[in-house]
Amino acid sequence: MLRLERKWDRRVEGWHSHVTSAAAFEQVLGRLIRLAAPEPTDTCVDLGAGTGFVTTALAPLVSSVMAVDISAAMTASLAGRAARDGLRNVSTSVCDLRKFDLAPASADLVVSSYALHHLPDPDKRALVARVARWLRPGGRLVIADMMFGRGGSGRDREILRQKVVALAAKGPGGWWRIAKNLTRYGLGVGTEHPATPEFWQSALRDAEFSDVVFRPVVAEAGLVYGMRPGI
C-alpha cells in the first residue's frame, strides 16, 4: 500500500480543484449531504476524505468530523483548508481504509465519496461490516461512488457507452485511454473496482443495516444509504 500512498501524495497538488470542477461534483455532494441528514450533535467520519471537499461541507453542520485518508499529503492539505476556514471540529487520520477501525458505537454518521471503488469487493464488504459496529443505534452510512458493473444491465451498458463517447471526443489522448481502460477492464486489473448498486445494497443488508436504499445521481454516480437499527 506504500505505492498507493505515494501515488496519492503526488496527486495532491491541484486535486481539490480537479474534483470540485467536475461536472457532477455539486450534484453528488449536495445529494450526499441531504441523504446523510447531518445533525448538530453528530460525530462523523469521512472515509477516503482526500483534500476534504465532503469534510469541510459537513463540519459546519455537525459536532465533529474525522477525515481518514491513506495519503499524508492529502490530509495535510485538508487540515490546512479546515484551519483557514475556521473549522475547529475537524481531525484527521492517515490510514489505509482496510486497516482503519474505531471503538464500537462511537459515531453517528459515516460518509464516503468516490473513494471505495479503490477497494476490491471483499474489502468493501469488510469495511461496511466494521462501519456497522462503529455506529450508534440510528447512525447512518452514506456512500457516494461510481456504481456500475461489467455490462450486465442496460444501465451498465449505457454508462460504459457514455464513457467511451466522452473519451473519444478528446482525440488521440482519449483513444489511448479507451484502449488502456478496455484492457484493464477485460483483464480485471488496475486500481479501480467499481461495484453495482445491487452489490452495495447487499453489503449493507448483510451487515444488518436497515432502510437500505440506492439513489442514482447522474451518469455512473450513485448513493447508497443505510441505518443501524436499534433506536
List each model region and its residues.
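Core SAM-dependent methyltransferase catalytic element
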Residues: 208-231
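Class I SAM-dependent methyltransferase SAM/SAH-binding core
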Residues: 51-99
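A short acidic, Gly/Pro-enriched loop at the edge of an enzyme's catalytic core
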Residues: 102-109
